Structures are given as structure tokens and as C-alpha cells.
Amino acid sequence: MWRIGIDEAGYGPNFGPLVMSAVACQAPSELVEADFWEVLHPAVGRCARRGGHLFVDDSKKVYQPGKGLAGLERTVHAFLSCLSHPGCHTLADLLQCLQTQTSVGPMIDEPWYHGGTTVPAAAAAADIASGSQNLKDALAQAAVCWGPIYSIAIDTPRFNGIVDRHGSKGAALAVAVVQLLRACLAHAPADDGLVIIDKHGGRNFYAPILQELCPDAWVVPIQEGMTSVYEVRWPQRVIRVILRPEADATSFEVALASIVSKYIRELCMEEFNAFWKTHVPHVKATAGYPGDATRFLADIRPTLERMKLPMDRIWRKR
């Protein structure tokens, strides 16, 4: 059976991409609702756990500004090593490896993006290799097959286009969820599964969004509210979908998806800040969140106007 987790990074900022990721694995039916922190405990652990484990936790606990990307990076690249795609040596490689077949090329309209940032950027190769081997051993012991992993990076121009078409920034999350789920479920069309999605915003009703997965599917609401639960039924399979707040605290796959999303967004923001630093040498780097983003915009505005860049190329409307 499939276990799939979905989470995002960058929904609230004014600058930089919204990144949403899905991580999936096939597990024996008796493990479909098991605690994977326990199942894979020889190789992985939460941030409070000591030792050489890969950290799988809320990305805000794994990564803290000023402490570098090594914690995120070691986990992401160890899990990527379980997939059968070529190695990733740059940010552009990483985005190419993780994009869905239907997603638009990443950041094609961002003036700051070049994709040449080398990855891994901070974690030592030996640390990644040891974590990867421990993970593969734990997965084999549990008879769990890891993958696929997908990410969608919605750059500012596309984010603003979605807002213009739908009148809501929440539509960007819906677009990404549908693309990611379609890509994951295409891997084994006859298998049942469990999908857990970290819920954001005030939406409680998701049946219309899930119906977009396939016109032939039958979406059955089981519960709608703070936590919303659905069954998506096809003639040959049933997928249970759970949307709940702070799911990265209780779902291993959601926590891992949050780490993948955060890692990609932080790499993107490094390129963002480096671009503006070359044009405005005195400007202090930003994470792109409200408040500080306003300060950053004021610092770069004269250069922005001189470059004749439209505001909606770099600044989100919502």
C-alpha cells in the first residue's frame, strides 16, 4: 500500500517561491498506519534524538537561520539516494529530478534564478553516505520501498497569475496538491493508500479539489472540519486522504515533505539574496517574510525601478 505525505514551505512570504513536496513509499499492508519513526529508528530520528541519525521532523526544528543547511541536506540527499534517478549536483538538477511531468519548468520567470548553486552545499559527503546506507538497511529490514519524491516550485509570477485567476492565494496550494497527487498515484494505479496533507488556511472542504484528480473518481467526504477526511474511490483502488493542521508533528511522510520543501526554498533564497547583493551591495539578506520583506523592498526599490522590473515579477500580491 502507498503512504504519501504532502507539505509546503513559503506560503506566507512576499519574496521567493512557494515550494510544495510529496514523498511516497510502498509499505506492507500491516505498516500502512505504523509510526515510521519507530519502524526506521535505526536510521532516522526526531531532532531531540542524539546520535548520527537522519533528522526527520518539522523543518523549522531541523533548520534554523544562521546554522546552515547541513541538517536538511543530509536527510534530503540520503532519501534521494534511494531513488533511481541521476545524481543532483546543482539546484537546477535537483528541481529537474523532483518535478512532475506536468509541472512547468521551475523559476523560469524569476530574474534572480540561475540554478547553478552546487548541492550538497553544506553537508559532508561522508555524512550523507553513512546516513544513506543506514537508511537503505532500515528500509530493507522493514520491506519498505521508498519513492517517488516530487516538488513543485511556484515562482512569484506564476503565484500572482494563480491569484489573479482564482482570487485567492489558497488556490496555489490546491493546484500543487492536485499535480503532486496525480504524479504519485500514477506509479501504481491499482494500489490503495493513505495520503496525509498538512492543512493551511481556513479551508475545510476539499472535495472539489480532490475531484480534479480524476473525473472518474468518486470523492466521499468522511469528515469535514478542523481535520478533513475523504475517500477517493476508483473501480480498482481506494485512497484515504486526511488533511489536518500541524501534520508534520505526527506524520513521518509529512515531516519529510516539509524538509524537502524547506531545503529547496532555502537554496532558492540563497540565489535570490546573492542576486540582489550584486546589484545593491549594502542590502541585508532576507528570508522574504512580511515585515522584513518590506524593509528589503525599500532597500532595493531604486535599483528595481532602474532595472525596469515590474513589481509582480518579484513581489507576491497576497
Locate the predicted segments by residue.
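RNase H-like, Mg2+-dependent phosphodiesterase core
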Residues: 1-318
